[in-house]
Design a protein with these regions (language model features):
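Extracellular and organelle-lumenal recognition/adhesion modules and their flexible linkers in secreted
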Residues: 26, 38-43, 70, 77, ...
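Short, polar/proline-rich extracytoplasmic segments that appear immediately after membrane translocation
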Residues: 2-65, 157-161, 170-180, 393-395
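Short, surface-exposed loop/turn segments at beta-strand-coil junctions that are enriched for proline
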Residues: 14-16, 147-156, 299-303
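A surface/secretory-pathway sequence property marking extracellular, secreted
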Residues: 42-51, 88-90, 94-127, 206-207, ...
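Short proline/glycine- and polar residue-rich coil/turn motifs
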Residues: 62-66, 130-139, 284-292, 300-301
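C-terminal, structured domain-capping segment
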Residues: 69-86, 90-92, 130-177
Length: 395
């Protein structure tokens, strides 16, 4: 394989459709240094930042992980009008030098990062690479990354890939055409549960009110499971994980877990720092024989009670509760949001990497649901999709 440097030369071309007229604006990317070059066309503003070149260094074929870690070509699209606007991004062929062979698209892979969220890499099969929609004052900060697809064999010596980014924008879109898609990662990216709670100790509470007959921790195909069988004869009793550290008072935290029980029951589950004097605000969850996901966001209180508790069902017969993927992090849920045009394809999804887990795809429910793909049509109402994972670490 020829190891010559192959450059992606970028020309930036903007087209904005304004009512019945069409305005063309061309911006040739030639700037260097720390400047930001902006152009306004109609009610849209387009900007190129200082990091504005794409280069395939030494003709190297890259894995997706390596390609996704390039600096990329950065630009932004901003709606400075008074209503919604849509736009599409194209990678068009640009003129290559006479006598040079154009590199076949099959060798090219690309990915977009939009407002800090990386989206899954795609092969360059269609020169329209993105459809976006912006509310008034909305802005998308975009990074385009392009690399040579290591999964495609062939000689690329002496070939060139030269493209121009074309953006078509339409200012005639109503807000009834916009749908907000939330991609829920279905795990907490900055999970610190084991930092704050000792999961090696299953503590019964209190006196002889509860009897733990079996408790263990193991991993199934989805994640870590805490399995407890117990009986008890008093309300406001149960078992808990003692705290290693205290949550910072007045800070916001989110916990999430999946749970099921051998019979239908209601249990209080959560941090004692949500509330005062050992109470957690009567946060009750109805558990059934099937796993269901539960999430809660709260502001931590400062009090002497700081365990994570599983309380308040009352039955002298043995009851089994299984808690899976129990996590906590500062802030809210780990999600990505994007506004899409109703009736178009979803097209691409957030790019997620999680240690010891394999991403199975995106579904309509956090535990079960139907699987969706890039051809799924954007629904007419705001919708959340959930990542599903398979645990592949040591069990």
């Amino acid at each position: 394989m020829d190891k010559k440097k192959i450059a992606i030369i970028v020309t930036f071309m903007l087209i904005v459709i304004l009512g019945l007229g069409i305005t063309y604006a061309w911006l040739i990317q030639t700037i260097n240094g720390d400047k930001i070059h902006s152009i306004r066309v109609g009610n849209f503003r387009f900007s190129l930042t200082e990091e504005n070149s794409l280069t395939l260094e030494s003709g190297e074929f890259m894995s997706d992980d390596k390609g996704m870690n390039q600096d990329g070509f950065k630009f932004s699209v901003e709606n400075i009008g008074v209503g919604y606007g849509s736009y599409s991004i194209y990678l068009d062929d640009d003129t290559i030098p006479t006598g040079t062979t154009r590199l076949n698209d099959k060798f090219i892979k690309y990915s977009l990062e939009i407002n800090g969220n990386k989206y899954s890499p795609l092969e360059l099969k269609d020169r329209k690479i993105y459809n976006g929609i912006l509310n008034k004052s909305g802005k998308d900060n975009i990074t385009l990354r392009v690399w040579l697809n290591k999964d495609v064999n062939g000689d690329i010596g002496g070939q060139a890939f030269k493209t121009k980014i074309r953006i078509e924008a339409n200012q005639e879109v109503s807000n009834q055409q916009a749908t907000t898609i939330t991609y829920d990662y279905n795990y907490l990216v900055n999970d610190v549960f084991d930092e704050y709670y000792n999961t090696n100790i299953f503590n019964p509470c209190c006196e002889t009110a509860i009897s733990l007959t079996k408790y263990e921790t193991y991993y199934d195909d989805v994640g870590r499971v805490f399995f407890v069988t117990a009986n008890k004869n008093k309300a406001n009793r149960g078992w808990y994980f003692p705290s290693n550290n205290v949550l910072a008072a007045n800070k916001t935290y989110t916990y999430s877990f999946e749970a099921k029980a051998n019979v239908d029951l209601t249990a209080i589950i959560g941090s004692e720092q949500e509330g005062t004097a050992g109470q957690i605000g009567n946060i009750k969850y109805s558990l059934t024989s099937e796993y269901k996901r539960y999430t809660r966001t709260f502001k931590a209180d400062s009090n002497k009670y700081s365990a994570f508790i599983f309380y308040d069902w009352t039955d002298t017969n043995d009851r089994t509760i299984e808690i899976r993927n129990l996590q906590i992090q500062e802030g809210g849920l780990s999600v990505a949001e994007i506004v899409k045009m109703k009736g178009t394809n979803l097209y691409t999804f957030p790019y997620l990497k999680r240690d010891n887990y394999q991403l199975l795809g995106w579904y309509t429910d956090p535990v079960n649901g139907d699987k969706i793909d890039e051809n799924t049509i954007v629904p007419s109402t705001d919708t959340t999709y959930y990542a599903h994972w398979k645990y592949i670490g040591e069990k």
